[in-house]
Regions:
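Surface-exposed amphipathic alpha-helical segments
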Residues: 197-237
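A composition-biased, non-transmembrane "mature-region" signal
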Residues: 3, 22-23, 27, 89, ...
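Secretory targeting signatures
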Residues: 1-35, 237
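Secretory pathway targeting signatures of secreted, lumenal, and periplasmic proteins
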Residues: 38-111, 145, 170
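Short secondary-structure junctions
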Residues: 36-52, 125-139
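Signature of long, low-cysteine stretches enriched in small and polar/charged residues
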Residues: 115-185
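Extended hydrophobic
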Residues: 182-206
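Short conserved aromatic/hydrophobic patches within beta-strands of well-structured domains
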Residues: 32-47, 229-237
Length: 237
């Protein structure tokens, strides 16, 4: 269950109520100016129980951003209205708090497994097909923390009528020109004794080519999208 929070800049002095108790909202810090310059807009902020451990709930305080400029460009040209790229940053909190002497590293394996499963499920809920988990690697954040980075592969096929993809029609296999390979990334790390999750997804092919339109706003490809997303992930704290 999600507990919506009014969109606001990097503030941590808000609260939400759950089961009669008032809890602080501890949103992660994100590079606001970089996001604004890149055409990203804040889609929502939520605080929700992401999953439960035997003795506690794990609450996720999340900021979700979408590439509004890319979405508008596609909508203007072909009438398909959906987010094509997204980026999120999450700070996890435990309710009740971890007991004295037990740090986040002691539950890292469990949290990591659940986070990876949840991210794959989220990609599927967004209409992406054939979601699969790929390789794992390491990366350094801008604060010097070491993060685990996992790649996800998926696909999306725009419906010519403007609806969601189904991936079940004839001619919609991975070799079909209108099928868009999608890449997702999920990073997990510990910063200042608290878990951070960050990630997102983007099309692997230029949307101008896939949608057969001439528009420089749709010309960017995977290298540009990949580097921008990974830079945003590194900047989360």
């Amino acid at each position: 269950m999600a507990y919506p929070v009014a969109p606001q800049a990097n503030s941590t002095d808000r609260t939400y109520k759950h089961e009669g108790y008032v809890h602080p909202v501890m949103m992660p810090s994100v590079p606001e100016e970089r996001l604004a310059a890149g055409g990203w807009t804040l889609a929502e902020e939520t605080s929700e129980t992401r999953f439960e451990l035997p003795t506690m709930r794990v609450v996720a305080h999340t900021r979700l951003y979408e590439d509004a400029e890319l979405r508008e460009a596609v909508r203007d040209r072909v009438g398909i209205d959906r987010p094509w790229r997204f980026f999120f940053a999450t700070r996890l909190a435990f309710r009740p708090s971890l007991a004295p002497g037990i740090g986040p590293a002691m539950v890292y394996s469990t949290v990591s497994s659940e986070a990876k499963r949840e991210f794959a499920a989220d990609l599927a809920e967004r209409g992406f097909k054939d979601v699969s988990r790929g390789r794992n690697q390491r990366m350094r954040t801008e604060t010097g923390d070491r993060a685990s980075l996992t790649k996800y592969d998926a696909s999306y096929r725009p419906d010519p009528a403007g609806g969601d993809s189904t991936g079940e029609r004839s001619g919609t296999g991975s070799g079909d020109r209108r099928t868009i390979p999608v890449t997702g990334w999920l990073a997990i790390w510990i910063h200042e004794n608290a878990f951070r999750l960050a990630g997102g997804a983007y099309p692997e092919r230029s949307l101008a080519g896939v949608l057969d339109v001439a528009d420089e706003r749709l010309d960017s490809g995977r290298e540009t999208y990949r580097e921008e997303l990974l830079d945003l992930i590194r900047a989360v704290r």
